[in-house]
């Protein structure tokens, strides 16, 4: 490596080091505030709760016992079929990976 490259690398590292120190000092001067992640989590949580409440109200308005029974039956049949096909797929993958003995 050339001396110019090493000099440029040292200067870049020095500038980055001063940037980090300056950022830490400016953060220490400010009063503590809630972190951005906490604010985002609270915002998403409130949106989720309002959407969940709206969906619950809509479900209660349009509740039909016959439709509910059909949906439950459809769910149980589809999960049974998926578990069967998942088992078949798993067996096929294992036989391909294992190879012939």
Curated annotation (Swiss-Prot):
Record bears the keyword Lipid metabolism: yes
Region: Lipoprotein lipase cofactor, residue numbers: 78-101
Signal peptide: 1-22
Keyword Translocase in annotation: no
PTM entry text: Proapolipoprotein C-II is synthesized as a sialic acid containing glycoprotein which is subsequently desialylated prior to its proteolytic processing.
InterPro entries found in the cross-reference section: Apo-CII, ApoC-II_dom_sf
GO biological process, one term: lipid catabolic process
Highest taxon above the source species: Eukaryota
Keyword field: Chylomicron, Glycoprotein, HDL, LDL, Lipid degradation, Lipid metabolism, Lipid transport, Secreted, Sialic acid, Signal, Transport, VLDL
An example molecular function term from Gene Ontology annotations: phospholipase activator activity
One CC-aspect GO term: chylomicron
A Pfam family: Apo-CII
Cited Gene3D superfamilies: Apolipoprotein C-II
Subcellular location: Secreted
Start and end residues of each stretch annotated as Lipid binding: 66-74
Protein's job: Component of chylomicrons, very low-density lipoproteins (VLDL), low-density lipoproteins (LDL), and high-density lipoproteins (HDL) in plasma. Plays an important role in lipoprotein metabolism as an activator of lipoprotein lipase. Both proapolipoprotein C-II and apolipoprotein C-II can activate lipoprotein lipase.
Similarity comment: Belongs to the apolipoprotein C2 family.
Name listed for the protein in its UniProt record: Apolipoprotein C-II
Natural source organism: Colobus guereza
